[in-house]
Swiss-Prot record:
Swiss-Prot/TrEMBL GO biological process terms: DNA recombination; DNA repair; DNA topological change; homologous recombination; nuclear DNA replication; postreplication repair; recombination within rDNA repeats
Lineage summary: Eukaryota, Fungi, Dikarya, Ascomycota, Taphrinomycotina
EC code(s) of this entry: 5.6.2.1
Topo IA-type catalytic domain: residues covered: 166-596
Protein name: DNA topoisomerase 3
SMART domains cross-referenced by the UniProt entry: TOP1Ac (SM00437), TOP1Bc (SM00436), TOPRIM (SM00493)
Limits of the Toprim domain: 2-148
Length: 622
C-alpha cells in the first residue's frame, strides 16, 4: 500500500515523518526550497495497514479566488456587478510547484492522508489538497489525522485512528472566503475610486475595505473619540487619617466623591462638630484569589502584549513555532477546560528538571496538585494550550521564544495548583452620618502565585488594633479636591477583548486583523506615555472613514461589529451542519447590496469627513 501524507507546513511534515518513520526517513528535494518529501514505512493498522509512505506539505492555502478578466478594470466595471460575478478558484501562482508535487506523489498512492491543522481553516486546506490529488488520481481515498500536538505517542495514536475531512467546516471557510473576497473587492473599489478623484493626498493609495478590519478600526476610533470628548470635572472628597501604634492609616470615604463643593463643605462641618469617630464594624473573613483558567488562544494573545511586551501576532507566531518543534500543544484553540481523561500528572512530570520550576513541579506531584478550573469554552477539537515537552532556554532560537514558552508552562502549572488564600480585615468608622472604611489584607498561602509571576496579590500594611464601638478623634479630617481622569487610548489586550466579545474574527485571526489595520495606515501603534505598554490611535484617514460611515446613516455602520458578528454566528451554524453554505452567502450578499447602494448614494458623507480630518494633517505622535 502506498500512502501520501500532506501537512500544512514543512516543519510539521518533518516532525511527523521523524516520529512515524522511527528515525528511518529518506528526504527528497522538491521544486520548492521550503518543502521536502519524506519517505518511510509505517503500519497504520486497520484498512490501510503496512505502507510505504511519503510525507510532504503545503504552505497554507493552495488556492485563491479571482474574478474573470472582464471584471479586472476598476474604472469601467460597475462595482455592484461583482455581487453576482463568477468567482474562479484556482491554485495560486506561489503554490503551483506544491500542487505539482502533490499530483506527482498522488499518482501511485491508494490513500491520501491529510495532516493539516485541526481547525476550520485546516479542514478547507485539506479539501484543497484532496482536489489537487484527485486531479491526477481520481480513485485515491482521502482520510484525515486528528491531532493537536507533536508528542510521539499522540502522533502514533492519531496515525492509527483517521477520520474524514469535515465538509461542514470546509464549507464554512468557503463561504467566508467568497464573502470576504466579494465584499472586499466591491467596497475597496468604491472607496478608492471615489476618494482618489476628490483628494490629491490619496491619489496613489488603495483605500482597502475588510469586513473584520473596519469593525477593528471602529473600536479604536470609538475609544479615541472618548478621549477627545473628555472634559475633566472637579470633585471633592473627605480625607480621614488616624494615627496609632506608630502607623498612619488613611480611611476611604464611602461616598468616594461629590461633585458639589458646598455640599462637601456642609458634610465636613457636620463631621467636625461631631468631633469623634466611632468604630461601627470590624469584619474578618477569608479571601481567595482564584488561579487562572487553562490557556486559550484569545487569552494568550492578550497576555503577550500585556506581560511580555510582544505583539499579539508575534506571540501567536512564536507559539506556533514552539508547536511545530513539538514543545507545546496546538496554539489555536477556543478551549479553556481540560478533558478529565487527560493525564496532567504525566505532563507535570516532564517539566521537572528545569531550574525555573523544578521544585514547584515536584511539589505538585508530591501532593499539592489540584484539578484545573473549567472555563465555559470547548471547541471539541483541541485542548487548552499547554507544554508538551520540557525545553531549556538555551535550546530555543531567541529570548522571545523562551518568554512565550515560559508563559505557557507557568500558566499550566498555575492551573494545576491551589488558589491563593488570605485573610481580609475591614474596619468601618462612623462620624455623624458619614462612613469611612479601611481594609487590610494578609496573604497566608501564595500557592499558584509562587509559579505565576504575571499576577500580583500582596499583603497590605497590617491594620493596628481597633475595638468595636471604640470612639476616637481623627488625626486629620479635611476636604480635598481632585479631577476626573481621562480615559486612555485602547491597548492591544483591550482591543482583542472587544473583538472577542463582539465576534470580530476568530481566535486565530484577531491578531492578523490588528496588524492589517496598521498596514493599511488606518491605525497607529505607539508607546503609552510613561509606560512600557503600547496603545492604538487612529490615523486621520482612519478617523475620516469611521466618521464618514457613521454619517451615512446605515442601520448597521460598516465600522460597527454587528454585521460581522452575525456572520460569524452563521458560519458556526454551517460548521455545525445547521445551515447551508449557499443560503448564508445569498443572505449576506442581499444584506450588503442594500448597504452598498445607500453608501454609494450618500458617499458625500465620506468625502466631507475626509475634508474635515485629512485636511487637518493632525496625525498622532508615534
Amino acid at each position: 500500500m502506498r500512502v501520501l501524507c500532506v501537512a500544512e507546513k514543512n516543519s510539521i511534515a518533518k516532525s511527523v515523518a521523524s516520529i512515524l518513520g522511527g528515525g528511518h526517513v529518506r528526504r527528497r528535494d522538491t521544486r520548492s526550497k521550503y518543502v521536502k518529501n519524506y519517505d518511510f514505512s509505517f503500519n497504520f493498522g486497520g484498512n490501510v495497514g503496512s505502507s510505504d509512505v511519503t510525507m510532504t506539505s503545503v504552505s497554507g492555502h493552495l488556492t485563491e479566488a479571482s474574478f474573470p478578466s472582464e471584471y479586472s478594470s476598476w474604472s469601467s466595471v460597475p462595482q455592484d456587478v461583482l455581487f453576482d460575478a463568477q468567482i474562479i478558484t484556482s491554485v495560486s501562482k506561489n503554490a503551483e510547484v506544491l500542487a505539482d508535487n502533490i499530483k506527482k506523489e498522488a499518482r501511485n498512492a491508494q490513500y491520501l492522508y491529510i495532516w493539516t491543522d485541526c481547525d476550520r481553516e485546516g479542514e478547507h486546506i485539506g479539501v484543497e489538497i484532496s482536489n489537487v490529488a484527485r486531479a491526477s488520481n481520481p480513485s485515491i481515498q482521502v482520510i484525515r489525522a486528528d491531532f493537536n500536538n507533536l508528542e510521539r505517542s499522540h502522533i502514533i495514536s492519531a496515525a492509527k485512528r483517521p477520520r474524514d475531512v469535515s465538509k461542514n467546516a470546509a464549507d464554512a471557510v468557503d463561504a467566508r472566503i467568497e464573502l470576504d473576497f466579494r465584499l472586499g473587492a466591491i467596497f475597496t473599489r468604491l472607496q478608492t475610486i471615489q476618494l482618489q478623484k476628490s483628494f490629491d493626498i490619496l491619489q496613489n493609495k488603495i483605500i482597502s475595505y475588510g469586513p473584520c478590519q473596519f469593525p477593528t478600526l471602529g473600536f479604536v476610533v470609538d475609544r479615541w473619540q472618548r478621549v477627545e470628548d473628555f472634559v475633566p470635572e472637579t470633585y471633592w472628597h473627605l480625607r480621614f487619617v488616624d494615627k496609632r501604634q506608630g502607623k498612619t492609616i488613611q480611611f476611604n470615604w464611602e461616598r468616594a466623591k461629590v461633585f458639589d463643593r458646598l455640599t462637601t463643605m456642609i458634610i465636613l462641618e457636620n463631621c467636625l462638630e461631631c468631633k469623634t469617630a466611632k468604630v461601627v464594624n470590624i469584619t474578618q473573613k477569608p479571601k481567595t484569589k482564584y488561579k487562572p483558567l487553562p490557556l486559550s488562544t484569545v487569552e494568550l494573545t492578550k497576555l503577550g502584549p500585556k506581560h511580555l511586551r510582544i505583539s499579539a501576532k508575534k506571540t501567536l507566531e512564536l507559539a506556533e513555532n514552539l508547536y511545530t518543534n513539538g514543545f507545546v500543544s496546538y496554539p489555536r484553540t477556543e478551549t479553556d477546560q481540560f478533558d478529565s481523561s487527560m493525564n496532567l500528572h504525566a505532563i507535570i512530570q516532564k517539566l521537572t528538571g528545569a531550574q525555573e520550576w523544578d521544585s514547584y513541579a515536584e511539589g505538585l506531584l508530591a501532593g499539592d496538585y489540584r484539578p484545573p478550573r473549567k472555563g465555559k469554552h470547548n471547541d471539541r477539537a483541541h485542548p487548552p494550550i499547554h507544554p508538551v515537552q520540557m525545553v531549556h532556554r538555551s535550546a530555543l532560537p531567541s529570548q522571545d521564544h523562551w518568554k512565550v514558552y515560559e508563559l505557557i508552562t507557568r500558566r499550566f502549572l498555575a492551573c494545576c495548583s491551589d488558589n491563593a488564600k488570605g485573610a481580609e480585615t475591614l474596619v468601618q468608622v462612623k462620624m455623624e452620618e458619614e462612613l469611612f472604611s479601611k481594609k487590610g489584607l494578609l496573604v497566608t498561602e501564595k500557592n499558584y502565585l509562587e509559579v505565576y509571576p504575571y499576577e500580583k496579590w500582596e499583603s497590605s500594611d497590617q491594620l493596628p488594633e481597633y475595638r468595636l464601638h471604640e470612639e476616637f478623634q481623627p488625626h486629620i479630617l479635611d476636604m480635598m479636591d481632585s479631577s476626573t481622569s481621562s480615559p486612555s487610548y485602547i491597548t492591544e489586550p483591550e482591543l482583542i477583548a472587544l473583538m472577542d466579545a463582539n465576534g470580530i474574527g476568530t481566535d486565530a485571526t484577531m491578531a492578523e486583523h490588528i496588524e492589517k489595520v496598521q498596514e493599511r495606515e488606518y491605525v497607529i501603534k505607539r508607546k503609552k506615555r510613561g509606560q512600557g505598554v503600547t496603545e492604538f490611535v487612529p490615523s486621520s484617514l482612519g478617523v475620516a472613514l469611521a466618521k464618514g460611515y457613521d454619517e451615512i446613516g446605515l442601520e448597521w455602520s460598516l465600522t460597527k461589529p454587528f454585521l460581522r458578528k452575525e456572520m460569524e454566528v452563521q458560519l458556526k451554524n454551517i460548521e455545525n451542519g445547521q445551515l447551508n453554505r449557499n443560503v448564508l452567502v445569498h443572505m449576506i450578499l442581499t444584506q450588503f447590496r442594500d448597504v452598498f447602494h445607500l453608501t454609494k448614494q450618500r458617499f458625500d458623507c465620506l468625502k466631507n469627513s475626509c475634508r474635515v480630518y485629512l485636511m487637518s494633517h493632525n496625525e498622532p505622535q508615534t
